[in-house]
Amino acid sequence: MLSTQFNRDNQHQAIIKPSLLAGCIALALLPSAAFAAPATEETVIVEGSATAPDDGENDYNVTSTSAGTKMQMTQRDIPQSVTIVSQQRMEDQQLQTLGEVMENTLGISKSQADSDRALYYSRGFQIDNYMVDGIPTYFESRWNLGDALSDMALFERVEVVRGATGLMTGTGNPSAAINMVRKHATSREFKGDVSAEYGSWNKERYVADLQSPLTEDGKIRARIVGGYQNNDSWLDRYNSEKTFFSGIVDADLGDLTMLSAGYEYQRIDVNSPTWGGLPRWNTDGSSNSYDRARSTAPDWAYNDKEINKVFMTLKQRFADTWQATLNATHSEVEFDSKMMYVDAYVNKADGMLVGPYINYGPGFDYVGGTGWNSGKRKVDALDLFADGSYELFGRQHNLMFGGSYSKQNNRYFSSWANIFPDEIGSFYNFNGNFPQTDWSPQSLAQDDTTHMKSLYAATRVTLADPLHLILGARYTNWRVDTLTYSMEKNHTTPYAGLVFDINDNWSTYASYTSIFQPQNDRDSSGKYLTPITGNNYELGLK
């Protein structure tokens, strides 16, 4: 039994003991494995390596993907820059979080803010949403809910489409779309993998990935992925503890119908995380240098996150070459943190801190602050689409059309306090032994709800054997309600691409894609500014 309580004081215990994790998961699946086969006297030996993986799990590529257009195509057929990071590559390169995947993906750069926060960019713009199974979640860099810390053991692959991706996401920056594809129960026999890892900075990591049929014919299958990780860091006092779990059931309801349903849980507890960086400059204008272990985090600082998601997918095949897909999800992400930052210059003579605003007058001599932030992000989303092929003028073409609805509520609370030079003393002697703030009650910092309704369609027309034209569009109705205003915008996002197959191995393409981003600023007459539009013109060779 897992029991969690999100808020904590100065101490907390691990949610689940790592030594029990693999055993609990295995015991959960063993009854179903026994039920699926007649009882025998044979001895079953479980070794540390998995059985033969499903087709594609041991490869760096996939045969087809819906990235970019939602139509199943090869990467060569997509008129945009696409990278697929497969499960095998993530295992080989030890890419264990979404952030680590993005750091190792072509065309994506990283700006590290502190120990746990990083911003990711593509083509000069910040990536401001992530997708799971094609359903986007939008986030603000102001609030750190741990999206980039999602554990990759729960996912089959990550699809990255660079540039404007309005056909897929609706709103956002013309940077990139990141789509995480969940693992499913694909095996009709019991199989799995249990691993343990030990490394620098007292790192220990345990992961179990088990599959089993729930019926004798294997038409109903289950997959459980669970893990635990604990590690320190080169930073003084820092410790991170993570527990993650995903359970999914896949059922073949008939020859043409498949239903999947599952639950995902992640919890990340960080002790003594930094909030911003170290003081860069001295009062005389010279720069500081520090040991890399140096940290501004006090002993009591923490940053905890908890993720709960339920999800469902229904797929129905019909007319031989057509398939309808319904994806639905409900997710709740909570965070609670108490942290401290330093924003000051250092007096080289005695190590005392001098605030950057001291010349503003009395009360402006503070050199940093503490913050108690907490909140929840809730997302409810539906996505229904159909894709398939049709014949016209003696040639085969592809068509995709559908609609989506999402509701996202962000509700955050804060309490702040300033820190003055005498409280810290000489920064040269700072070792984290700093008294915790006498916190004032939290106040509401943000409460908004965003509704997005979309209709979209795209087609891939074969103009000649080597020449393919892709046309598409997405119509989006976007509305946000906050404590002080409401705003609604409608926007149509076009998509066009042309792909020419040079030979069996090479293609060249040209494309125009777009995306839009609503603004909450107003002009002098009080009207909201028109949305920012991002346009992407691209030529490429694959």
Show where each model-derived region lies.
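Short acidic/polar hinge/loop motifs at secondary-structure boundaries
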Residues: K110, L119, I135-R162, V181-R182
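Extracytoplasmic beta-strand/coil segments of soluble accessory domains associated
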Residues: N61-T83, Q93, G99-P136, E156
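Outer-membrane beta-barrel translocator/receptor signature
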Residues: Y138-F139, L154-E156, L167-G247, L253-T257
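Structural signature of Gram-negative outer-membrane beta-barrels, strongest in the C-terminal barrel
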Residues: D252, R377-V379, Q396-M400, S404-Q408, ...
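Non-catalytic regulatory/gating segments with a bias toward low-complexity or hydrophobic composition
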Residues: V82, M90, V101-M102, V158-G163, ...
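Transmembrane beta-barrel strands of outer-membrane/channel proteins
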Residues: V194-Y198, I224-Y228, A261-Y265, L326-H330, ...
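Short, acidic, small-residue-rich periplasmic hinge/interaction motif at the N-terminus
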Residues: A36-Q87
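Acidic/polar loop-and-plug regions of large Gram-negative outer-membrane beta-barrel proteins
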Residues: Q229-S233, S246-R317, E332-R377, D422-L444, ...
